[in-house]
Amino acid sequence: MNIHEYQGKDILRKFGVAVPKGIVAHSPEEAKQAAEQLFEEQSSPVVVVKAQIHAGGRGKAGGVKLAKSPEEAYEIASQMIGTTLVTHQTGPEGKEVRRLLVEEGMNIDREFYVGITLDRATSQNVLMISTEGGMEIEKVAEETPDRLLKIQVDPLFGLQGFQAREAAFFLGLEGEQFRSAVSFIMSLYKAYTSIDAALAEINPLVVTKEGRVLALDAKINFDSNALYRHKDFLELRDITEEDPFEVEASKSNLNYVRLDGNVGCMVNGAGLAMGTMDIIQLAGGKPANFLDVGGGASPQTVEEGFKIILSDKNVKAILVNIFGGIVRCDRVAGGIIEAAKKIGLNLPVIVRLEGTNADIAQKMLDESGLNLIAADGLKDAAQKVTEALSA
């Protein structure tokens, strides 16, 4: 689960992570009041008005602006709130700006990157440090790997002081800035583990000309599987920032991710779903979604899956790929037929069913009289997807 920057900073502040003072605003009037308060409390000649959306690249897209007065903050907020911000992470449709973070200005001297996430290859947390702050860490890792330090952290022992000192030394910090950075990194790791985060990313971490070490931006992603331990964090979820199809799918416990292709796919099992998407691509189509209906696919989940797939107007054909292990293929076939009649499917649906009672399922599909095309194996399914798209 993702949250906004201002929410992430509020959480980090409770763990002693240094962040600039900021006030969230939902209107130009609130932005002006926030700026007035910050100008009274700080010596900086500017405040920063930042659009709050679940996407990076806001600065380049015009979502981060400086204001030298409360009146200017009001004008900036008037232009931002209600507009659609398009960044390299939002896609061409962009995201609507509904709230802003008005924050004290910083006299920045240097910018760095600090991030913590899970390294699945080693089953350990990894602390990532880079001297290239403000840049995408993937780009840094690819183009200038010598400027990125990765420190594996044993979850049994946690982040050790010598590891935090190694990170601060890598950044070239000295004296009080060195000690502040060590304290910052230790506090960030404590926050990361305490809240069961999947990612804690500070980009950039800044050192001001006055010597302060702060998180200028903060991205916190929660491990959704651990949210039952942090029910108060559920209140931080902003559904308006999420894909409406994915929100609807989650209500039916379906794992759905919308893509930009033309072939909808419904599969049971994440691995099979990934393979099915590859098959669609090789067949000349483009997957319109990732949809895993789970190991216990029922007529109800199949029906909901079809509804969600059909709500995407770019879909020209649907491939259903089910391996019947726990779930019986004839039960899934019955769900497909029932859903097709109920919804009124008018797109070609290619169905590949293998496993328990697959022969019975095949017969049910053949005798249904519906536009359901049975496929015998993955290769045949791929060929029939190609034929359906070219028809």
Swiss-Prot record:
SUPFAM superfamilies with a match to the protein in the record: Glutathione synthetase ATP-binding domain-like (SSF56059), Succinyl-CoA synthetase domains (SSF52210)
Q: Which residues bind Mg(2+)?
A: 203, 217
Q: Which controlled-vocabulary keywords does the entry list?
A: ATP-binding, Ligase, Magnesium, Metal-binding, Nucleotide-binding, Tricarboxylic acid cycle
Manner of cofactor binding, per the entry note:
Binds 1 Mg(2+) ion per subunit.
Q: In which pathway does it act?
A: Carbohydrate metabolism; tricarboxylic acid cycle; succinate from succinyl-CoA (ligase route): step 1/1
- Alphabetical list of InterPro entries matching this protein: ATP-grasp (IPR011761), ATP-grasp_succ-CoA_synth-type (IPR013650), ATP_grasp_subdomain_1 (IPR013815), Succ-CoA_synthase_bsu_CS (IPR017866), SUCC_ACL_C (IPR005811), Succ_CoA_ligase-like_bsu (IPR005809), Succinyl-CoA_synth-like (IPR016102)
Give the EC number. Answer: 6.2.1.5
Cite a GO CC annotation. cytosol
* Annotated substrate binding sites: 268, 325-327
Please tell me where ATP binds in this chain. Answer: 50, 57-59, 103, 106, 111
Enzyme class label: ligase
Q: Which residues form the ATP-grasp domain?
A: 9-248
Its needed co-factors are: Mg(2+)
User: Catalytic activity, per the record?
Assistant: succinate + ATP + CoA = succinyl-CoA + ADP + phosphate; GTP + succinate + CoA = succinyl-CoA + GDP + phosphate
From the UniProt record, give one GO term of the biological process aspect.
Answer: succinyl-CoA metabolic process
The Swiss-Prot or TrEMBL record annotates one GO molecular function as:
succinate-CoA ligase (ADP-forming) activity
Q: Which family does it belong to?
A: Belongs to the succinate/malate CoA ligase beta subunit family.
Q: What does this protein do?
A: Succinyl-CoA synthetase functions in the citric acid cycle (TCA), coupling the hydrolysis of succinyl-CoA to the synthesis of either ATP or GTP and thus represents the only step of substrate-level phosphorylation in the TCA. The beta subunit provides nucleotide specificity of the enzyme and binds the substrate succinate, while the binding sites for coenzyme A and phosphate are found in the alpha subunit.
The record ties this protein, via HAMAP family, to:
Succ_CoA_beta
Please describe the quaternary structure of this protein.
Heterotetramer of two alpha and two beta subunits.
Q: What is this protein called?
A: Succinate--CoA ligase [ADP-forming] subunit beta
This protein's species is Chlorobium phaeovibrioides (strain DSM 265 / 1930)
Q: Which gene encodes it?
A: sucC
